[in-house]
A protein has these predicted regions:
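Bacterial N-terminal signal peptides
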Residues: 8-16
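Polysaccharide-binding surfaces and accessory modules of carbohydrate-active proteins
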Residues: 26-43, 63-105, 109, 125-238
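Beta-strand-rich recognition/accessory modules
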Residues: 36-38, 126, 194-307
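Active-site-proximal substrate-binding groove within the catalytic cores of carbohydrate-active enzymes
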Residues: 259-260, 264-270, 503-687, 695-709
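An acidic-aromatic substrate-binding cleft motif
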Residues: 275-357
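The substrate-binding groove and active-site-proximal loops of carbohydrate-active enzymes
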Residues: 310-328, 357-372, 438-457, 490-504, ...
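Active-site-adjacent "subsite" loops/lids of carbohydrate-active enzymes
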Residues: 323-327, 374, 391-468, 553, ...
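Acidic/aromatic-lined carbohydrate-recognition and catalytic surfaces
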Residues: 348-429, 506-526
Length: 710
C-alpha cells in the first residue's frame, strides 16, 4: 500500500510539472507588460521591448509565440556586407490605437553606433488574422538596406502532431519541420554560418507554387501568407536555432523581403498575414484563394485541353546533332505509340535544325527533312487522326552562338550580374562518352524578361506555331522567377531585380491575349508551377517530383482546381504502378518522357500497358477524371481505413472517388458518402468492391474509381 502511495504521489508530481510547463508561457504573457490586440478568434501581444509575447488561437487556447524578437534587418556598406541589426541593441517606442500596434525604431543602433535608419513596424488585427506591416527609411550615407526578415515567430510553440505544409511543387507535407530544416544538404552548410542556425531554402515564385505555407494539425493550424500583388520574390523563412551546442530545436518561421533601400530611399510592405485557424489543412487553401480571387485572371480552357490525358514529350533532334526522330515519325510510330496508351497529344522538342537546347532563339526549320512544307505536312497528317500538336520554344535562354546573340541585340537583352557580366547557364546533355557533357557544353545567357524585343519575339513564335498548324505553343521555363535576375549597377550599390516572376506573368498574359484574339481554341503552356503564371496558361508542365512520400500536390489541386498540370520523371519501366496511380489519384496529366525524351513508350512495355489501363478509366469518366472534374480531396465523404488513400472529384450531380493503397498487405475499408448513391466502379489490379459500393478491399498498388450520383 505504501509503495502504491509513493507511486501515485510521484505521478501526481510529474503531472503537476507538465501542467506547469504547459502553462508557464501563458502565465508569463499575462504578467509581462505589453500591448494586446484581441477579437473572437485571435489574441496577439507585443511586449514593451517589441518582442512577440502572444500569438494565440483563442478557440484552442494555444499560444504559438515565446517572447522572441519580431525582426532582423541586414545592410551593406562599401566595406562590409550583410551586417545584421535586430532588437537586442534597439529600444522601440510603441503605441496602440484601435486594432493596430505601432513599433517605431528611430536611428537604429548597430555595434553601438546610431545610424540614420528608421524602422516602423505595424501589427494589425483583421478578421481573425494578423497583418504585419513595415516601413524602412534609410538616410545613412554609404549604405543600402538589403533585407528585412519580418515578421518572425521565433522559438515557436507547435502543438504536438502539427506538420509543415509548403507549396513546393504544388504541395509538400513534412511530418517534422525541425527535422526537415536541420537535415539540409551538407554541401550548402559549407557556405553558411551553420553554427548559428539551419535554414530550409524556399522562395516564391520559384519552388513555392503559391506565396504561403502553414503548420497544420488535424483540426487547427497556423497559416503564413504573403498577400503581395507586386509578386516581389519572397523567401519563406524557415529556420532552426540551437538551444545548446549543435542542438537545433528552436523553430522560427516568417518572411524575408528585400528593400534594397539606399540613402534617401523609403520602402514599405504590409503584405504579411499570419492566422491561427480552425479546421483541416483545406482551410489554408480557402484563406489563400479568397485573397487570390481579388486578382485571379484564369480563363476557361478549350474542351480539347480538358479532355487531354497528357502528352508524349519527344525530342526530334538532340543538342549534339543526333536525330532521334524525323518529321515523318510524327504521323507514324509516334502516333501509334500515343494511341496505344490513350494519349493524343505530342509536345514536340528539338524540331528545328540546330536541335534541342541549341541555337536559341533561331528556330530555323530543318531543311534536310524537307523544310517548312514537310513539317507542316507532318503536323497536318498527325492532327488529321484526331491528335493535337504542342510546339516547343524556350522562353528565356539565349545561345551565345546564335545569330541574334552574335549579330543582333542579344547581348543587350540578357541578364547581367552584380559586376555587369552576363550570367551563364549550361545544359549538359551527353552522348555515350564523357567529353560532351563535362567539357564541350553549350553556353547560354538568360533573356531579360523586361526587354520589349524579347517579349515581341515570344509573341512572334506563337504566330509561327499557328502558321505551322499546331494546336498550342509551349514556352519552357517561363513559369517561375529567375534564380539569376538582372542587376542594375548604375547606382551607388548594385541592386538585383526581384520582379522577374511578374515580368514572366506579364509576358504570358500578353501571349495569351494575343493568341486568344486570333483563335480561342489555340492554347498556351509553360514549365514550372506558380499561381501567378499558371493563371494565364491552359496547361503547365511541372518541374521535379509529385510522387515522393512527402509530396502533397493536393494543396494546389484543391486551391486551384481549374489549373491543369502534369507529373514528371516517370521515364522507364520502374515503379510504374505506384507513380502512374498517383497521377490518377491526384488529378495530374501524364508527361510521357521515355528515357528523358529520347525514346517512345513502346520501348517500355510495362509502362505502356499500365498507362493504357489508367487512361481507359479516364476516358470512361472524362467529365470527372479529366480537366472538367473539380478536385475535392475528401470533402463530402469518409473512408474508415487510414491505409487507403482516397480522393474525390465532383462535377454536377456526380462524384468520383479514386482509391488505392501502398500497403504491402493491402487494405480494407468502408466508404461513407452521404447524399449519394453508388452507381459503378472500375478497377485495376487486386480490388474488390461490394455491390453497394460501401466497402472495398485493395491489394498493394491496386486502384479503383467509384462513381456516385445524387
Amino acid at each position: 500500500m505504501k509503495k502504491i502511495t509513493i507511486i501515485l504521489a510521484a505521478l501526481a508530481m510529474l503531472l503537476s510539472c507538465n501542467i506547469a510547463k504547459n502553462t508557464a508561457a501563458e502565465e508569463c504573457d499575462c504578467v509581462v507588460p505589453g500591448f494586446m490586440l484581441s477579437d473572437d478568434n485571435i489574441e496577439v501581444k507585443v511586449g514593451e521591448d517589441g518582442c512577440l509575447l502572444v500569438l494565440r488561437n483563442k478557440e484552442t487556447g494555444h499560444n504559438y509565440a515565446s517572447g522572441n524578437g519580431l525582426w532582423r534587418l541586414f545592410y551593406n556598406t562599401h566595406e562590409e556586407k550583410e551586417m545584421q541589426i535586430d532588437n537586442r541593441e534597439n529600444t522601440p517606442a510603441i503605441s496602440h490605437e484601435g486594432n493596430i500596434i505601432t513599433i517605431e525604431y528611430k536611428d537604429l543602433v548597430h555595434r553601438g553606433k546610431a545610424l540614420k535608419m528608421d524602422l516602423t513596424l505595424t501589427v494589425a488585427l483583421e478578421d481573425g488574422s494578423v497583418r504585419f506591416g513595415s516601413t524602412v527609411i534609410n538616410n545613412e550615407p554609404g549604405t543600402i538596406v538589403r533585407e528585412l526578415q519580418y515578421p518572425l515567430v521565433g522559438n515557436m510553440n507547435l502543438p504536438k502532431g502539427h506538420k509543415l505544409l509548403t507549396t513546393h511543387t504544388g504541395g509538400q507535407l513534412h511530418d517534422d519541420a525541425i527535422d526537415l530544416i536541420v537535415n539540409v544538404n551538407p554541401k550548402t552548410l559549407y557556405m553558411k554560418p551553420d553554427q548559428y542556425f539551419r535554414q530550409y531554402d524556399l522562395q516564391y515564385p520559384r519552388h513555392a507554387a503559391s506565396n504561403c505555407y502553414a503548420f497544420v494539425g488535424e483540426s487547427d493550424g497556423l497559416y503564413f501568407g504573403s498577400h503581395d500583388e507586386s509578386l516581389q520574390q519572397t523567401w519563406h523563412g524557415l529556420r532552426a536555432y540551437p538551444s545548446a551546442a549543435n542542438k537545433f530545436d528552436r523553430l522560427e518561421a516568417g518572411f524575408y523581403r528585400y528593400p534594397n533601400a539606399m540613402c534617401g530611399d523609403t520602402w514599405t510592405c504590409d503584405a504579411s498575414i499570419v492566422k491561427p485557424y480552425m479546421g483541416s489543412w483545406t482551410e489554408t487553401s480557402r484563406i489563400y484563394r479568397e485573397w487570390r480571387n481579388t486578382w485571379w485572371d484564369k480563363q476557361e480552357v478549350p474542351q480539347w485541353v480538358n479532355e487531354m490525358t497528357g502528352w508524349q514529350r519527344i525530342i526530334f533532334k538532340h543538342q549534339y546533332g543526333e536525330y532521334l526522330r524525323k518529321y515523318t515519325d510524327l504521323p507514324g510510330r509516334i502516333n501509334d505509340c500515343g494511341k496505344s496508351v490513350g494519349c493524343n497529344t505530342v509536345l514536340a522538342f528539338g524540331w528545328w535544325s540546330d536541335g534541342m537546347d541549341n541555337g536559341y532563339p533561331n528556330y530555323y526549320i530543318d531543311e534536310t527533312q524537307g523544310g517548312e512544307d514537310a513539317w507542316k505536312q507532318a503536323i497536318s497528317d498527325y492532327r488529321a487522326d484526331g491528335n493535337r500538336l504542342v510546339l516547343y520554344y524556350n522562353g528565356r535562354l539565349v545561345d551565345r552562338e546564335s545569330d541574334w546573340y552574335k549579330h543582333g541585340n542579344g547581348k543587350k537583352a540578357t541578364n547581367k550580374d552584380n559586376t555587369g557580366a552576363e550570367f551563364a547557364e549550361h545544359y549538359k546533355f551527353t552522348g555515350e562518352g564523357t567529353t560532351l557533357g563535362y567539357y564541350d557544353t553549350r553556353t547560354f545567357s538568360i533573356a531579360n524578361m523586361a526587354n520589349r524585343e524579347w517579349r515581341d519575339m515570344l509573341i512572334d513564335w506563337a504566330d509561327r506555331a499557328m502558321a505551322y498548324g499546331a494546336d498550342a505553343v509551349f514556352y519552357d521555363q517561363l513559369g517561375v522567377a529567375e534564380e539569376f535576375p538582372n542587376w542594375d549597377i548604375s547606382g551607388e550599390f548594385p541592386v538585383q531585380d526581384l520582379y522577374t516572376g511578374r515580368y514572366k506573368a506579364e509576358a504570358l498574359r500578353e501571349i495569351r491575349d494575343h493568341i486568344k484574339a486570333i483563335n480561342p481554341e489555340f492554347c498556351l503552356g509553360t514549365e514550372w508551377l506558380s499561381d501567378c503564371t499558371a493563371q494565364f496558361c491552359d496547361f503547365v508542365h511541372i518541374v521535379e517530383f509529385t510522387a515522393e512520400p512527402y509530396s502533397f500536390p493536393e494543396w494546389f489541386k484543391y486551391t486551384f482546381p481549374e489549373v491543369i498540370w502534369s507529373d514528371r520523371c516517370l521515364r522507364d519501366d520502374t515503379d510504374v504502378e505506384r507513380r502512374a496511380n498517383n497521377t490518377l489519384l491526384k488529378g495530374l496529366v501524364n508527361d510521357i518522357e521515355i528515357f528523358r525524351c529520347r525514346g517512345l513508350i513502346d520501348e517500355t512495355p510495362h509502362y505502356q500497358g499500365y498507362l493504357a489501363q489508367i487512361n481507359a478509366i479516364r476516358h470512361k469518366y472524362p467529365e470527372l477524371l479529366l480537366g472538367a472534374g473539380r478536385f475535392i480531396h475528401t470533402d463530402g465523404f469518409k473512408c474508415s481505413s487510414k491505409d487507403i488513400i482516397a480522393r474525390g472529384y465532383a462535377n454536377g450531380n456526380r462524384l468520383a472517388i479514386v482509391a488505392t493503397t501502398l500497403c504491402a498487405d493491402g487494405a480494407s475499408g468502408k466508404l461513407t458518402v452521404p447524399g449519394y448513391r453508388f452507381v459503378e466502379s472500375s478497377s485495376i489490379g487486386d480490388v474488390k468492391v461490394t455491390a453497394n459500393g460501401s466497402k472495398l478491399t485493395i491489394g498493394q498498388n491496386g486502384i479503383t474509381v467509384l462513381i456516385y450520383e445524387n
